[in-house]
Amino acid sequence: MVVDDPCLLNIPTSFYHSTNQELDLSNKTFKREVGGPYSVMMDNKIGKPHLLETDQQNFFQDSKPTNEVHAVKGERENSGESEEEEDEDDDDDDDDDDDDEEGEDEDEVNYKREQIIVEVNLNNQTLNVSKGDKGVPKDPSQIKTSSDDEGGDSGEDDQDSHEDEENNPLPLDGQTNMQHGNQDQKTENSDMVGGDGTIPANSTKEQGKGGEAPKRKKKPKSPSDKAKSEEKETLTCDKCPRVFNTRWYLEKHMNVTHRRMQICDKCGKKFVLESELSLHLQTDCEKNIQCITCNKTFKKLWSLHEHIKIVHGYAEKKFSCEICEKKFYTMAHVRKHLVAHTKDMPFTCETCGKSFKRSMSLKVHSLQHSGEKPFRCENCDERFQYKYQLRSHMSIHIGHKQFMCQWCGKDFNMKQYFDEHMKTHTGEKPFICEICGKSFTSRPNMKRHRRTHTGEKPYPCDVCGMRFRFSNMLKAHKEKCFRVTSPVGVPPALQITLNNPTLSNPSQGISNLPNAHIPPPSPTPPLNLNALNPLPPRPIPHPFSHLHLHPHSHTHHLAVPPVPHLPPPPALFKSEALNHRGQNDDSFLRHLAEKTSAGQHH
């Protein structure tokens, strides 16, 4: 041990020193404004070659990416600043050693991370960012520093800088300021590149290009165009199915096509395309389908077919009046119609003095005075005063009415009524009220409406004398007026005998109907007025029905029947009192007598 001690003592002091002296670099590190980012001054000790090799490996040999280099530099600065603060505070040397060892461990961790290669041009602007394989750059010759750029020609630098300023007005600040030694620029790099080696998001967009050589585009897009193209690759129009690559074409399409809407001049409706407007004019807006007969226009073809079938199916009126445009079947009818527009009335009736415009009107009027019936039915030899009456009568023999509506199936005896009915389907209302302006399909309907303004009531009640404006109102009144209740408990036959003084004579055989004994019926039935036309049995009315019986001079003899004759057709309103069934009292009383006699025989 004694021999070994002198050997140990003979070791030069230059190869043996404490760890604190080797790693305490707070006072030996400084910044300078030259091409190299850092420079370190150290004593001639063993740690000096090691530190130089580390610096060369970080910055030149392994060509670490700039973001990792900045991370290491930032960590060293932070560690250096922390060491300076510890020296100023007079901390222990052991604490300094621990901090330095932690900083070296962090450097080793950062060094082992994946390499990222940043390519710059002569003007220190970033061209490409790529990743290396296993920490080795793909093409180290592509990395350029500011010291290499300084050897270039000044003319090329000016030209490149001018072009690059136009193409890339907003360069990446963290990657451009990497080559400068200003303290402000270094602080900006440390802010943009974190301690963990992350890079900004703008640089990661170009990582897919790899380590290929930079290719300068002839006419690069401006940042606004790039942003628009990246925002939507395919832009679809909202109003039509067209698709565009750029927003500029889409806006141009919107201005030309959709914002200049096609407006219909007739109805004001707007359309996107001109073809839609033309289709609208042909179908919906313009009535371009015209009837040849009456010149009426329609929108649809089927409407024209229905119009021809309904209106012009039976005949075609090709001739029209020049004054009122009324149409007729022949020109002769037109000439006869023109007389209606003149004020002259040369044809006068000799009997009553009434004047007419046409001779035919005078002939028709003269039939009222003479009673002549020139129109005869060939089937039953019945004669009529007017031709329309004969036409209406012919429907009895035919089995159906002559004029039938093809639209609804309703039939009519007279053509006048048929024409008025057809107007309900076509929508024509030529008759207008002079007071309120309401239009109607027929003149009788207009006259009935006009009574609401004038207050005219032409329909009186025969029983009570009350007057009504319309015939249906009178009919409803008659049903109510004849339904007057009689006293309860009185037999209907007895009620009739009490109220009728003409039947109170017992000699007639009807006054005491419940107690009277009528002899057996004679060979000639007393109640049959005519053997060819017997009266059908009538049902007995309600016991509470009251019959308005008026005294009259007609007496019916049961033994002698009246002379056979054809009864005339019943009038609309008889002068005699009617019961609730619209029958006279005589026929009803005869029916009661027949029923009573039949009950007594049984």
Swiss-Prot record:
Entry keyword Zinc-finger = yes
Major location (coarse): nucleus
Sequence ranges of Acidic residues compositional bias:
80-108, 148-167
Q: What does the function comment of this entry state?
A: May be involved in transcriptional regulation.
Q: Does the keyword Hydrolase apply?
A: no
Biased composition regions of type Basic and acidic residues, renumbered to the chain? 65-79, 222-232
Could you tell me which SMART domains the record lists for this protein?
A: ZnF_C2H2
For biological process, the GO terms are: regulation of transcription by RNA polymerase II
Annotated family: Belongs to the krueppel C2H2-type zinc-finger protein family.
| GO MF terms, alphabetically ordered | DNA-binding transcription factor activity, RNA polymerase II-specific; RNA polymerase II cis-regulatory region sequence-specific DNA binding; zinc ion binding
Q: What name goes with this protein?
A: Zinc finger protein 652-B
State the residue spans of region: Disordered: 60-232, 543-575
Name the InterPro entries for this protein. Ikaros_C2H2-ZF, Znf_C2H2_sf, Znf_C2H2_type
Q: Where in the cell is it found?
A: Nucleus
Q: Which UniProt keywords apply?
A: DNA-binding, Metal-binding, Nucleus, Repeat, Transcription, Transcription regulation, Zinc, Zinc-finger
- List compositional bias (Pro residues) regions by residue number: 561-571
Q: What is the lineage of its organism?
A: Eukaryota, Metazoa, Chordata, Craniata, Vertebrata
From which residue to which do the C2H2-type zinc fingers run? 235-258, 262-284, 289-312, 319-341, 347-369, 375-397, 403-425, 431-453, 459-482
What are the Basic residues biased-composition ranges? 545-557
Q: Which GO terms describe its cellular component?
A: nucleus
